[in-house]
């Protein structure tokens, strides 16, 4: 995981001299100028590939096979030759797919028909720059580079500018769905040059996941918008996973439910408004037995959660844009705290010695399990609405800052299939933004407002019960606090502003008069109450 936001001012990826190669007639019977020892193809070397892909780790390999299976001849390349061989073997075993493997950047680039479109799926940061540099010398004006990794959006904007200075087109394309999605249909979020998208949209629309209202791909917008949207998608994913883990924690430790019962419950929830990929896989996880010891495998997994940085970037961007995203921030904080395993174990011992008592056992005896299960279902759904609202508000704020003109309803649509956060209620989010493209928040959409109001009593019961039992539910608590804060016409922020004016002369506005005001608070306090003056001295 990168601990800092990547710099957007690193050297150009096109530092090697750009070479404009003479046009080659790829449609002629003359073989491409590479040796047979450096290229192997499952289809005739006389035909040029329609697209290329570099980076044959799990995601790249599966996406390449997906493209080939959809009928688009593809060239692949990887610095490690064994990965090329492995991909060729898979292409043959999975149906003699039209995929050709190449072992040098030159042979790889020249095997693709013009204007070339090359997808890069390597580790974000400098490896992307290095990969582009190795390819760019053999590319020509009008060719396109497509970065499909989880890249910091400003790096994409820098590379896009570098590409333009050399006549190339550039896309930063978020790819979501994991290895299965890449192989059978991911959600794709391409942003950058529209011409680059237009050149390959016929391929992307076939490769992407398919839902009732079309393929899960759309042109996101200019610049680094595609990577930014994928980043926020991942931030929402952090929130989703945290909320589900809290539902599990309450049901297991307050409700006393077994893994078998939890598997059944999540299966049932996956037939409700909670139907989603993450709920589905959670049900599966509870059903898996440990093959090395007794009991369920999930109980043997160390309670430390990893991360790669996109959640952190999301929270940083929310702070920079003054967008409240407490549910996503809470999920990030929980990942940090999960990493403090030894500290947490030590804290548990010290606090127990100091007299800390676990209340969960006493509370468990009086719990109505059936009601608890239904309450947790409602609390989870209401909390999810708040988490998605925060992510959408962040996208709207960034779109306004950058002039991207993001279509939030369309983003919800392409997340309905293929991606990790795919869920049935994304269709409701799509419809909310179709009803009102300028919707201030999902919380105030008429349909979602009804859902929230109907579920708030159950939501409060779950959070209150968890607090009483000493079970932390930071995501649900943050979501409920967000809801309660957002719906209040007047907050205690007036006192905070008075304090700021008291110690820093930051001024304040009044509710009854226009303008800004400053008050000599300590002086007036002494005048109004002699006891205050005495206390201050």
From Swiss-Prot:
Transmembrane segments: none annotated. Substrate binds at residues 150, 176-178, 233-234, 238, 308, 335, 500, 506. Keywords: Chloroplast, Gluconate utilization, NADP, Oxidoreductase, Pentose shunt, Plastid, Transit peptide. Homodimer. This is 6-phosphogluconate dehydrogenase, decarboxylating 2, chloroplastic. Catalyzes the oxidative decarboxylation of 6-phosphogluconate to ribulose 5-phosphate and CO(2), with concomitant reduction of NADP to NADPH. SUPFAM superfamilies: 6-phosphogluconate dehydrogenase C-terminal domain-like, NAD(P)-binding Rossmann-fold domains. GO terms for biological process: D-gluconate metabolic process; pentose-phosphate shunt, oxidative branch. NADP(+) binds at residues 55-60, 78-80, 122-124, 150. Residues 1-44 form a transit peptide. One of its GO terms (cellular component) is chloroplast.
């Amino acid at each position: 995981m990168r601990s800092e936001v990547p710099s957007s001012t690193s050297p150009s990826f096109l530092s090697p001299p750009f070479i404009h190669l003479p046009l080659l007639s790829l449609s002629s019977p003359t073989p491409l100028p590479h040796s047979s020892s450096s290229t192997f193809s499952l289809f005739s070397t006389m035909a040029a590939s329609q697209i290329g892909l570099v980076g044959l780790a799990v995601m790249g390999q599966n996406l390449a096979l997906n493209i080939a299976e959809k009928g688009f001849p593809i060239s692949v390349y990887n610095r490690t030759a064994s990965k090329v061989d492995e991909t060729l073997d898979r292409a043959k075993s999975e149906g003699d797919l039209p995929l050709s493997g190449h072992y040098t950047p030159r042979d790889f680039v020249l095997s693709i028909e013009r204007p070339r479109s090359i997808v890069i799926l390597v580790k974000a940061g400098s490896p992307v720059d290095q990969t582009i540099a190795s390819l760019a010398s053999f590319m020509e004006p009008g060719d396109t580079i497509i970065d499909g990794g989880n890249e910091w959006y400003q790096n994409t904007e820098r590379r896009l500018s570098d590409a333009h200075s050399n006549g190339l087109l550039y896309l930063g394309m978020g790819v979501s769905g994991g290895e299965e999605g890449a192989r059978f249909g991911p959600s794709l979020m391409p942003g950058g040059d529209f011409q680059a998208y237009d050149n390959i949209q016929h391929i992307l629309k076939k490769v992407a996941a398919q839902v009732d209202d079309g393929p899960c791909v759309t042109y996101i917008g200019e610049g680094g918008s595609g990577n930014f949207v994928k980043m926020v998608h991942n931030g929402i994913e952090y929130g989703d996973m945290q909320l589900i883990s809290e539902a599990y924690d309450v049901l297991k430790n307050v409700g006393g439910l077994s893994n078998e019962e939890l598997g059944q419950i999540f299966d049932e929830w996956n037939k409700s408004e909670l139907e989603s990929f993450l709920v589905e896989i959670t049900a599966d996880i509870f059903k898996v037995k440990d093959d090395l010891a007794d009991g369920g495998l999930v109980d043997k997994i160390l309670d430390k959660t990893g991360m790669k940085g996109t959640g952190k970037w999301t929270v940083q961007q929310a702070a920079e844009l003054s967008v409240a995203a407490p549910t996503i921030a809470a999920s990030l904080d929980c990942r940090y705290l999960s990493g403090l395993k030894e500290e947490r174990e030590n804290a548990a011992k010290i606090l127990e010695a100091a007299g800390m008592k676990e209340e969960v056992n006493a509370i468990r005896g009086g719990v109505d399990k059936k009601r608890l299960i239904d309450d947790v279902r409602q609390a989870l759904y209401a909390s999810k609405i708040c988490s998605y609202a925060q992510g959408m508000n962040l996208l709207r704020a960034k779109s306004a800052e950058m002039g991207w003109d993001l279509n939030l309803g369309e983003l919800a649509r392409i997340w309905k299939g293929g991606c990790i956060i795919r869920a049935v209620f994304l269709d409701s989010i799509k419809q909310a933004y179709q009803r009102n493209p300028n919707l201030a928040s999902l919380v105030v959409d008429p349909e979602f407002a009804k859902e929230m109001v109907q579920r708030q009593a159950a939501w409060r019961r779950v959070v209150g019960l968890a607090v009483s039992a000493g079970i932390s539910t930071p995501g649900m608590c943050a979501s409920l606090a967000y809801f309660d804060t957002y719906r209040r016409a007047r907050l205690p922020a007036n006192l905070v502003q008075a304090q700021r004016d008291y110690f820093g002369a930051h001024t304040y506005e009044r509710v009854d008069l226009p303008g800004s005001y400053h008050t000599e608070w300590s002086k007036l306090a002494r005048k109004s109450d002699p006891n205050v003056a005495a206390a201050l001295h």
